[in-house]
Amino acid sequence: MKKHNFYAGPSILSEYTIKNTAAAVENFAGMGLSLLEISHRSKEFVAVNDEARALIKELLDVPAGYEVVFMGGGASMQFCMVPYNLLNKKASYLDTGTWASNAIKEAKLFGEVDVVASSKDKNYTYIPKGYAIADDSDYFHFTSNNTIYGTEMRKDPDVKQRLVCDMSSDIFSRPIDISKYDIIYAGAQKNLAPAGVTLAIVRVDALGHVDRPIPTMLNYATHIKKDSMFNTPPVLPIYAALQTLKWYKEQGGIAAMEKKDLENAAILYDEIDRNKLFRGTVAEEDRSIMNVCFVMNDEYKELEDEFSKYATAAGMVGIKGHRSVGGFRASLYNAMPKSSVEALVACMKEFEKQH
C-alpha cells in the first residue's frame, strides 16, 4: 500500500528529488564515487552549491545586495545568529508559537526585546493584529508559519521597520518581497531538503553595525565571504535541495506552488468544516496552508484514538497532532500530491459514515 506522508518535518520530498538524490548516492556526476564520499571542494560539488544558491535567487526574485548562504545548526541556531549580528539596542518580536518564543528567549541574551504582541493567551490559535512597533527597533522578527499550532502569516507585514523572518515551514510556498527583509532564514526539512542544512537570505549592508565581537561561525559575513564553504557543508542535503529547486522551476515556480498549496489546503479545510466529527483549532483567517490542525468535536472526543488507528490502517502517516495541541495535524508542504489530500478526506468521510 502506498503511504501518504503528512509528517511535519522531516517531511515529504518530491519523487524527482528522491530519485535523483538516490542515484547520486550510487554515482555522483559520473565520477564513479558516491555523493556521500566526495570532496566538498571538488569542482562537481562546488557547481552544485553554486547552482542551488543561484536557483534560490531566481525562484524568489532576490534583488541585488542580498546573498544566499547555506549553514548548519537549523533554525534554532538562527535564533541566536540573528540578534548576534543585528541587535544593537532593541528589537521587536511577535510571539505566535513555540518557535517564536524560542527566538525571543535567545534574543534577550543580546539586548532589549519588545514583544509587541502574543497569542499565547489563547494557546496560539490566532495571529495578533493591530500591534505597534517602536520606531527605534533595530528590526521586527516574526515566524511566518507555526507548524505546531497551524497558524500562518501569508503576507509580508506592512511596517516601516526592517523585517527578519523564520520561514522554515512555508518558504517557497508564496511570493515574497525580499526587499523588505534584512534576513530570511529557514531550516530545510519542510520545503527544501532533508534535515542538515539551513538557508539564509541576507541583506549584506545590514551586517557589520553591531558593537560586539561575533564568533567566526556565528557571523553571517563569514559564510557569505566563503560561499557557504567556510567549514565542510552538508553535501547530501544541499544536493537534495538543488533537486527540489529544479523541480520547483520545472513545475512552474513559486506561483505554481502557491496555487497547488492553496487548492490542497482548501480541500482539507472544507472537509473539516463539513464533517460532523471534526473541527479546526485556529481562527479561520489565520489558518495555515502548510499545517492543517484539527480535533474531534467535543461530543466525539472518545473516537480520537479510533480514528488515528483507522487512518493509519488506510495508509495515512504522520497525522498525530503535536502533544501541546493534541488531535491531528496534516502537513501539506509543496511536494504533497493532491491525491494524498483526497485520500485523507475520503478516509474522514468513510469514518464519519461509520459513526
From Swiss-Prot:
Binds 1 pyridoxal phosphate per subunit. Its EC number is 2.6.1.52. It is found in: Cytoplasm. Pfam families: Aminotran_5 (PF00266). Its cofactor is pyridoxal 5'-phosphate. Pathway: Amino-acid biosynthesis; L-serine biosynthesis; L-serine from 3-phospho-D-glycerate: step 2/3; Cofactor biosynthesis; pyridoxine 5'-phosphate biosynthesis; pyridoxine 5'-phosphate from D-erythrose 4-phosphate: step 3/5. L-glutamate binds at residue 41. Pyridoxal 5'-phosphate binds at residues 75-76, 99, 147, 166, 189, 231-232. The keyword Amino-acid biosynthesis applies. Keywords: Amino-acid biosynthesis, Aminotransferase, Cytoplasm, Pyridoxal phosphate, Pyridoxine biosynthesis, Serine biosynthesis, Transferase. InterPro entries: Aminotrans_V_dom (IPR000192), Aminotrans_V_PyrdxlP_BS (IPR020578), Pser_aminoTfrase (IPR022278), PyrdxlP-dep_Trfase (IPR015424), PyrdxlP-dep_Trfase_major (IPR015421), PyrdxlP-dep_Trfase_small (IPR015422). PANTHER family: PHOSPHOSERINE AMINOTRANSFERASE. NCBIfam families: PRK05355.1, serC_1. Catalyzes the reversible conversion of 3-phosphohydroxypyruvate to phosphoserine and of 3-hydroxy-2-oxo-4-phosphonooxybutanoate to phosphohydroxythreonine. This is Phosphoserine aminotransferase. The lineage of its organism: Bacteria, Pseudomonadati, Bacteroidota, Bacteroidia, Bacteroidales. The gene is serC.
